[in-house]
Amino acid sequence: MQSKKKWGLAITLAMVMLVSTACNSTNGGASSNEATSTSGNGSTPASAKTITLGFSQVGAESGWRSANTKSIQDSAKEAGYDLKFSDAQQKQENQIKALRSFIQQKVTVIAFSPVVESGWDTVLKEAKDAGIPVILTDRAVDSPDKTLYKTFIGSDFVEEGRKAGQWLNDKYKDTQEEVNIVELQGTTGSAPANDRQEGFMELIASNSKLKVIASQSGDFTRAKGKEVMQAFLKAHKKIDVLYAHNDDMALGAIQAIEAAGLKPGVDITIISVDAVKDGMQAAADGKINFIVECNPLLGPQLMEAVQSVVDGKDIEPRIVTDETTFTSEQAKEALPTREY
């Protein structure tokens, strides 16, 4: 009996030592990992946790916007981020409501593409006070306080307008007749609408023969582009050029031009911005003469910026995307391998 008791005690002690060793080994492993990924106070940094990204999109008004949304959703999934997505349906009040919801949910980072440029200071200050960094994508905000956001990722819209104006200048540099231009603007008050107009007007100002005879918002939609172009055609007997701030408005305008018995790209020269697939197809078909690219695939750059902000790294206040331009012939060549 004494022998059995000794064996029982020995087995019990062995088991206790084994469990103790296993627990110490587990804790030791965690401590080792924390040494390379935690801050000095021993807490786990945000980069080691699941990053929650609150993103408020303008809407789904165009093919460009759809491609932009998909790029962000796919990139967030690939990065392993928890994406909270909100569609503002092109209304600033919806977007402000979404940003405040993100603040209440205590997301890690907020990113959004502003519907319009102004009116953001109050909600951005709320995010700053809550310690939530903000990243702007595609569109900028008009605010004197640049500390309200970490960076702005997107195109140089003024430069896009300049490219459109430069091409038109070159096309009509030797003309002796007045060239009547109509302009389909984007959403009133939005950064791309303001800037694309500014850059375009800056470049054509050097040619006194180039005259903008009408300019109206088509709200970046195909339906509105068609509607406004119909009004232009009724109001003006001679239209030589259409400058559209995006492909969808240009495509709507093409429908109106064809319905009026005219040939788009021949009777009326058409310049557009975006270079999405439908626009590129129209260019390849000769219906759009010149397209300035605006790259919607901002997802990878956004996720990289989010990670840098979370890790406390320095980040450029302005990140400009690389873009090009397409004539009809160049669009025809590029179309088969076009990603969007």
Task: Mark where each language-model region is.
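Sec-dependent N-terminal signal peptides
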Residues: 6-15
